[in-house]
């Protein structure tokens, strides 16, 4: 059995990982920001330290890492969280700086392995260099820098796996799903007889499967050096995905009309104006987003299955996420937002 130290053990993904690891007989200790989401299924065997890891001293962190075999970073922010300019500073603070600080402490404490939750946009940047994604999207750039920090930390006694995560579905009681943003975007078209949407698609999996992937990566036998693993269990076109979304919203047989990027781009100028007005520095270039969403960002499930991930009901997970997002959007439930720290 292994001892594992995790940052973000009460979050949607960290909690799933902890549950899987504990079920498999490992010990998990985590630092998390209070408050706990109401009714969240946090495993009682997990040793929880409440507080902000960034406010703890090196000595305190080193003490927590003492005797641990693996460090899991299940915290950070994704591209849906809004920040003022310069957005890179915030990505650095939440997604990169903690690793630069904790990796050396891991090594001092004798921790041999780390697993970091990254983004499949890094995978896209690497396979489509012609799109210049990192120049135009600070979020993409920050995730590639994060991978670089992980790569540089590796040595003969320390290996790091970055899980390049795609769209994730599933809910945690008391926590607002990130998909509330999607409801905000599409509900504006509810009065139209159809929904206009890009023609691409995406890789995806359920939060339970992400938990299994994290556990598999953490306990991987004979892992050496740096690995960036593109994660996916299902690939779905946007129109099929939206079909499930609209069913979950009670709008049956909704007509989805695929539009080319230039048409979606026309609608994005308003968003650029809105960001300017509100002082938001977007992590994604709104004028390039139509081209990203026109692409089938599909990934084979091979690498994920290699980590011991099992099948799950993706349609049920999407439905669940959307139902809670819809309620949240309508203001029916008080839910905790994703926190950066």
What are these regions (language model features)?
Residues 97-141, 161:
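Conserved Rossmann-fold NAD(P)-dependent oxidoreductase catalytic core, especially the SDR/UDP-sugar
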